[in-house]
Amino acid sequence: EEINEIKKRDTLSKKQGGEESVKKHHEKGRLTIRERIDCLLDSKTFDELGVGAGVPVFDDNNELIDFQPANFVLGFGEVASRKVIIGGEDFTLKGGSPNPAGLRKSVYAEQLALQYKIPLVRLHKGGGGAVGGTSQNKNHRPIGEPVFNMSRFYSLAQALGVVPVVTAALGPVAGLPASRLVALFRLVLHGYVMAS
């Protein structure tokens, strides 16, 4: 039963913000975060972490009926045969504004880069805060304590001193994604801000 729920979460997570949201994204000539990651990495090297992270919604019989995935996609991959950690906001989910699981995964990216001493690649496109607040739906289970208790900027500062960090703004950014950009050297190219 638990295995089936994990598989169902994984399937729902891959739908990102839903078919309509992904379609609108494509109609504007834009790629989703998973598509961008696939374009950047060596073919078939992306090993996504935390696919099933997010907020499950259960019915009155405790059956999983919906799932809001973490809006940050994260994983290991290779660029020119070199192992990297790569991640970015999923703009198809509420414009990339962080949900609790997505925020945790975004901070975890820096921790993984430090742990494995490998480059960190960030592809930013998203807001810096959810303006709608948290859901009061009785079918949402509580998230619990954050997996990190330190300042979100602590792991960023550590990573910048230890591993190569490359950050690209691939659309509008605000809040924490924007702060990650300004923490690095910036180079403006054709209307995009890139940092390394």
Per-range role (PLM):
Residues E1-T167, P172, P177, A183-A195:
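Terminal-region recognition feature
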